[in-house]
Amino acid sequence: EPGSAYKVNMEGALNVASECRSSGAKLVYISTDYVFNGLKGARYHEFEPADPLSIYAKSKLEGERVTLDASRGNLVCRVSVVYGWNRLSGKSNFVTWVIDSLRKGQEIRLYDDQLVSPTYAPSAARDILELGLGNLKGICHTSGPDCLSRYDIGRLVAETFDLDASLI
């Protein structure tokens, strides 16, 4: 729902940014690669203009804007396709969804016309903590090093976990 996306991603960031400014604290805002339209066919860099297509992406870009407008010392970290084992809530992510689907013998359809940089959650957490504690400010891409389609990721997951890649 558009209203809740903006309430969480823009208004929430604005509220936190205001409190951080009042207390002199640095805000590290976690954003997304979805702020780009994905048509480039290669890795995006921090200095490239955003062109969000979805309500979610537009709300995240607004969250970035209010974060950076609140203080020149704030940091925006963009991540992409975050994955890992979520032992606390059991909530799935793209990689665990692929594993679960293939283990159940379900055929899945994955697109190959958009590239993403999958990001291992523990690595992202470590990197973002280091960046937040340092002097970096502005926008930083903190995604993984690879640039792959979701189809490619699915095939790698199937191969890694010895699952039936023909279901992809």
Region spans (language model):
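NAD(P)-cofactor binding segment of oxidoreductase domains
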Residues: E1-V28
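Conserved internal alpha-helix within the Rossmann fold of NAD(P)-dependent oxidoreductases
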Residues: A13-V16, E64, I128
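Helix C-cap/helix->beta junction micro-motif
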Residues: E19-S23, A70, F161
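SDR active-site strand-loop-helix element
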Residues: L27-T32, N37, C77-V79
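Active-site "gating" loop of Rossmann-like NAD(P)-dependent oxidoreductase/epimerase domains
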Residues: D33-L53
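Active-site helix of classical SDR
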Residues: S59
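NAD(P)-dependent short-chain dehydrogenase/reductase
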Residues: R65-V116, P122-S123, L129-E130
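Mid/C-terminal beta-alpha module of Rossmann-like enzyme folds, strongest
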Residues: D127, L131-I168
